[in-house]
Curated annotation (Swiss-Prot):
The active site is at D203 (proton donor), H225. Involved in maceration and soft-rotting of plant tissue. Hydrolyzes the 1,4-alpha glycosidic bonds of de-esterified pectate in the smooth region of the plant cell wall. Keywords: Cell wall biogenesis/degradation, Disulfide bond, Glycoprotein, Glycosidase, Hydrolase, Repeat, Secreted, Signal, Zymogen. Residues 21-29 form a propeptide. This is Probable endopolygalacturonase B. Disulfide bonds join C32-C47, C205-C221, C331-C336, C355-C364. Residues 1-20 form the signal peptide. Pfam families: Glyco_hydro_28. It comes from Neosartorya fischeri (strain ATCC 1020 / DSM 3700 / CBS 544.65 / FGSC A1164 / JCM 1740 / NRRL 181 / WB 181) (Aspergillus fischerianus). Its EC number is 3.2.1.15. One of its GO terms (molecular function) is polygalacturonase activity.
Amino acid sequence: MHFFQSSLVAATMGAALVAAAPAADLETRSSCTFTSTSALKSGKASCSTITLHNIAVPAGETLDLTGLKTGTTVVFDGTTTFGYKEWEGPLISASGTSITIKQNPGGKIDCDGARWWDGKGGNGGKKKPKFFSAHKLNKSNINGLKVYNIPVHGFSIQSDHLTIKDVLIDNSAGTKLGHNTDAFDVGSSTYITIDGATVYNQDDCLAVNSGEHITFTNGYCNGGHGLSIGSVGGRKNNVVNDVTISNSQIINSQNGARIKTVYGATGSVTGVKFQDVSLKGITKYGIVVQQDYENGKPTGNPTNGVKVSDITFEKVTGSVTSSATDIYILCGSGSCTNWTWSGNSVTGGKKSSKCKNVPAGASC
């Protein structure tokens, strides 16, 4: 039997002592344990607490947590695994309002991404499933998930009022062949908080492509491409506003604190703050702002269609490797304005001779 509704049993036992509750109330209180995706699909609508016990998701299927009843709690218990197939995914999808997703002690979500890794990520080779779609997961919380070896792209976030706390994404086994393993991609979202994330990966630890009122704090990012705004431009939504990245470490990564916008595009990046961010072992740029991205690559020729204003870099400190560049700022004419630059110190690398249109107060 794939699931059990414990509250219905309790309600039956207590019938002689209390008046019977309406059926709708019983359904709302029901607690269900599922051991298969088929049982989850057919039974989730009647459950207010869902426990996923040692789920083995069949190849080519999504663990479907969409359309959950308002206020549902989902608990990952034991080890969650996924069958192998070349497809786009996602491996997990969740939506709903006032949802809590968490994990029991000792639990883990093991994607076994090595089966897909070929060094090409999403740019060719095997078709790789994305990990977790958090679209329309509103006024909700994701707490304490431990995730291992995603094939490509981690959490895709398009939600409002979503808090993600104390999540581990450990793709350290993909150092050689893992690629495009972004941890958190945020787009068209408002009031997103990511607190206490620990990430070992091979791409952006955080990438905010659009959205407002976004906080990333107390993070640890190792091995990837750093904490990024962008690239901004060329999408339906090209506005980033009020983003705070604070009290975080970026270790052994390609970049540290980064803002990048698309060549020839329009949009805006405003109210972004990098505060108390420490760097170590950065291999390309410690602090970087570039307005020259075309087809995903820098051109060296910045444009000014995306305004980058009211930006704060405060106490971004640490070291890069000797072959890296401490700070690189490449702005379009007049597009980078009203920056606050305070207490930043990036050392160990080269000084750039290619900076352009550096705003007043900043240094390059």
